[in-house]
């Protein structure tokens, strides 16, 4: 984008990344305004005070930068699209990634629909990712800082959204962003963002307990032998070892959950490795790149080490991902995001890891 006369709305959380993103755009001569999201209704018991604290901090940063600051209430769509799905997924023994849905539906999706109300043409965020536009279209790329790259959380964004997005931090490194914030004495928090912003204390159990009941059930081994009792599927995730309450000479981990039977299966560490993963809601962003292109890698969790993709094939409404080497604890509900070099090719939601019929 070269037209500095068109207003850019910067999604501001009060954190260092979005604050420096706004500052960098100002330094480049752009017309900038800040916008923060009201994501909690007044009757929401969890996280409302935390959300208001962030909004107030963003307002302070905007004042320090000398730019207008606005608040947009997206609490309804956030509740419907993010929190409700989060709870539903956990009730089924899955482990969702709410940030991906939030970016698609709320923080980017819904906010892009709002910015014309402010006569703005673009939305900027503090994500560590890049957008490349060329004769083949608009592409999503990793951020330059591999340790902070957030393209994983953005893989569902359509090209028409990417074409209106600006990522000022895409070519920068976190250490430099912190240095810039200190140099400009911006009133921001240096703490990393919460994994799940609507559970700022990290107490998933208490959060879920306000929205659903927990039904105890059996813990089984691979042979079907009953080893113990679990306290409710939402309290567990694939790969979990702590909190099982099992007396065993072998280290056992949650390997599978059956919501219909309300059972949890456990297995040894090595038995959680798989080189076959079934994906739903599959997205392929780059139609010009075949599914059998060599050199593709996949991340099955945000912090997971990448694994080489051997083959992608369609099976009914799903896609089967076959890997050159196994990954550990492929978790239903998490996203598997596929890359070729720095480019995000697509991905889907993990339904099952292991032998797929």
Curated annotation (Swiss-Prot):
tRNA processing keyword on record: yes
Marked site positions, Interaction with tRNA: 127, 334
Residues noted as binding ATP in the record, renumbered to the chain: 11-18, 37, 126
Disulfides per UniProt: 102-197
Pfam families, A to Z: tRNA_Me_trans, tRNA_Me_trans_C, tRNA_Me_trans_M
Gene Ontology CC annotations of this record: cytoplasm
Family to which this protein belongs: Belongs to the MnmA/TRMU family.
PANTHER family the record matches: MITOCHONDRIAL TRNA-SPECIFIC 2-THIOURIDYLASE 1, TRNA 5-METHYLAMINOMETHYL-2-THIOURIDYLATE -METHYLTRANSFERASE
Protein name: tRNA-specific 2-thiouridylase MnmA
Species whose genome carries this gene: Dehalococcoides mccartyi (strain ATCC BAA-2266 / KCTC 15142 / 195)
């Amino acid at each position: 984008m070269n037209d500095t006369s068109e207003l850019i709305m910067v999604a501001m959380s009060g954190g260092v990344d979005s604050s420096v993103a706004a500052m960098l755009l100002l330094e480049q001569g752009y017309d900038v305004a800040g916008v923060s999201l009201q994501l909690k209704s007044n009757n929401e018991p969890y996280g409302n005070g935390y959300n208001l604290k962030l909004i107030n901090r963003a307002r302070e940063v905007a004042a320090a930068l000398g730019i207008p600051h606005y608040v947009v209430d997206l609490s309804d769509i956030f509740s419907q699209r993010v929190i409700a799905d989060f709870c539903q997924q956990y009730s089924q023994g899955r482990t969702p990634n709410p940030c991906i849905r939030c970016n698609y539906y709320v923080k980017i999706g819904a906010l892009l629909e709002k910015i014309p109300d402010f006569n703005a043409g673009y939305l900027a965020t503090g994500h560590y990712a890049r957008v490349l536009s060329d004769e083949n279209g608009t592409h999503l790329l990793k951020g330059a800082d591999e340790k902070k790259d957030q393209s994983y959380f953005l893989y569902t964004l359509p090209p028409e959204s990417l074409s209106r997005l600006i990522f000022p931090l895409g070519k920068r490194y976190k250490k430099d962003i912190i240095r810039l914030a200190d140099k400009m004495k911006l009133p921001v928090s240096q703490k990393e963002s919460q994994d799940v912003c609507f559970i700022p204390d990290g107490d998933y159990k208490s959060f879920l307990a306000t929205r659903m009941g927990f039904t105890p059930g059996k813990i089984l081994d691979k042979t079907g032998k009953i080893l113990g009792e679990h306290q409710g599927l939402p309290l567990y995730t694939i790969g979990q070892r702590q909190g099982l309450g099992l007396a065993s000479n072998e280290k056992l981990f949650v390997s599978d959950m059956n919501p219909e039977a309300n059972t949890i299966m456990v297995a040894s560490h090595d038995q959680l490795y798989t080189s076959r993963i079934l994906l739903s809601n599959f997205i392929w962003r780059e139609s010009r790149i075949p599914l059998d292109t060599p050199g593709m890698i996949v991340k099955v969790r945000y912090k997971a080490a990448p694994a080489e993709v051997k083959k992608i094939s369609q099976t009914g409404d799903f896609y089967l991902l076959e890997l050159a080497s196994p990954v550990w604890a492929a978790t239903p509900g998490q996203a598997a995001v596929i890359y070729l070099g720095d480019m995000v090719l697509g991905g889907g939601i993990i339904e099952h890891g292991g032998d797929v019929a």
